[in-house]
Amino acid sequence: MKGALRGTPRVVRVAAAQMGPIQRTDSRESAVARLVALLHRAADQGAQLVVFPELALTTFFPRWFVDDIATADHYYETSMPSPATQPLFDAAKQRKVGFSLGYAELTADGHRFNTQVLVERDGAIVAKYRKVHIPGHASNEPNRPFQHAERYYFEPSDEGFGVWNAFGGRIGMMICNDRR
């Protein structure tokens, strides 16, 4: 495979899908319906890969601090795909369009990550990446009208920055503050 990639022009048409705000009261299903609509729109315009934002399934909940982190468990995914996100995977497979999806992940052993998956055009997950550089603060700052408590809600990944074979080439992922 190494030789086949070298010198071969690879062009992938990528769509950046901007969702707009998700309210705290919005359901996961309504967020996924918006993602599916954006995927179809991108596919209609010839996209092969749709990149969705960080934490695309929920409001950006680190803006609000809760004393008991377990009360925020409903923001986290424990499996991917899940019953709520399966329609997005099905649409990707049907339209033969891959995607990258950001979400909050709660592992079976209780770890919380800001995670991104890369999904190929057949609807299969080919890579999972967890945010390395977590910004913000880890405790409540009561004088702030909005928090930036990512360090409270997420732990940094120790897996580093990976690169995977996908979309006819090599592709990596990073999330927001990882760009530094």
Regions found by a protein language model. Give the residues of each.
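Short polar catalytic/cofactor-binding loops
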Residues: 18-24
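Hydrophobic positions in the central parallel beta-sheet of the AAA+
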Residues: 17, 50, 172-174
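Active-site catalytic loop in hydrolytic enzyme cores
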Residues: 90, 107-180
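Active-site metal-binding loops of divalent metal-dependent hydrolases
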Residues: 19, 55, 178-179
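Beta-strand-turn-beta hairpins that frame and shape the catalytic cleft
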Residues: 3-14, 162-172
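Alpha-helical scaffolding within the catalytic cores
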Residues: 1-2, 84, 159
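Cys-nucleophile CN-hydrolase/nitrilase-fold catalytic domain and related Cys-dependent amidase chemistry
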Residues: 26-122, 126-130, 136-137
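Conserved beta-strand scaffold positions in the cores of enzyme catalytic domains, especially
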Residues: 14-16, 128
